[in-house]
Amino acid sequence: MPQVRVAGNHAPDHELGGPLDTSDPTVGRLDPDLLGALQAAARDAQTDGVRMVVTSGWRSRSHQQRLFAEAVRTYGSEAEARRYVSTPDTSEHVTGDAVDVGPTDADSWLSRHGARYGLCQMYANEVWHYELATTPGGRCPEVLPDASSRR
C-alpha cells in the first residue's frame, strides 16, 4: 500500500495521523469506490514522488455540526459560513462521499491527474476537497466557487 496517511479533520498541509487504516472510521466509512480510487491515485502519486495525506474523510453529523457552528462564529453568519463548511444535512463528508487531501503537492497532483481515477476537485476555494464525481478517465464537472454554490 502507498504511503497515504490519515490526518486530523480539515487541516490541509498539516499531517496529524498515522498510516491509512480502514479501521479508522474517517477512512473506513468512506464510500468504497471513493476509497479505492483514492488508494489507486495515492499509489501512482507515490511513484511520482508525491505522498498523499488524508486530512479529513467521513465525519459524524455531530462533528460536522461543530465545524459548521465554528465557521458561523468565525465568519459571522450562516450564509458566509456555508461558503466554507456545509451543514450536516448537505455535507458530502457525512455520507462518506468526500475526502480532503494534502499536503499541497498532493492537492496539485490530484488537480492534474484526479480525473484519471474519477476524483474531482469540487470547489475553487477548497483545493484539498475531492469527490468521486466522474468515471475513471472521464471529465470532471466544472469547479464551483464554493460549497454554498452547490445547494
PLM segments and residue spans:
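Cell-envelope/glycan interface and biosynthesis
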Residues: M1-R151
